[in-house]
Curated annotation (Swiss-Prot):
Entry superkingdom: Bacteria
Similarity section: Belongs to the MinE family.
Tagged with keyword Cell division: yes
Keywords: Cell cycle, Cell division
Function statement: Prevents the cell division inhibition by proteins MinC and MinD at internal division sites while permitting inhibition at polar sites. This ensures cell division at the proper site by restricting the formation of a division septum at the midpoint of the long axis of the cell.
GO biological process terms, semicolon-separated: cell division; regulation of division septum assembly
Protein name: Cell division topological specificity factor
Length: 87
């Protein structure tokens, strides 16, 4: 065994860098896709609630959060008094 061959790299750095970049891009795309889903869910949930109860969009508080691999969508809606009274 040649001593110089022992310390040489078997792979060039370009393929390794390409693999790392592909992993980074895939991760970024996955994160951005999830936030788009949360925005769509927010709009659809508000549309369904507005279909059944008259709500003021200015009295709606929406929080989008992310903790590790979990995304959260928190919606606080101030309901009008008439909607809270049972008929």
């Amino acid at each position: 065994m040649n001593l110089f061959n022992f310390f040489t790299r078997s792979r060039s750095t370009a393929p390794v860098a390409r693999e790392r970049l592909q992993l980074l891009l895939a991760h970024e795309r996955a994160l951005s896709g999830q936030s788009d889903l949360a925005v769509v869910l927010q709009e659809e949930i508000l549309a369904v609630i507005a279909k059944h109860v008259s709500i003021d969009r200015e009295k709606v508080n929406v929080k989008l959060g992310r903790d590790g691999t979990v995304s959260t969508l928190e919606i606080d809606i101030e309901m009008p008094e008439a909607a809270l009274v049972k008929n």
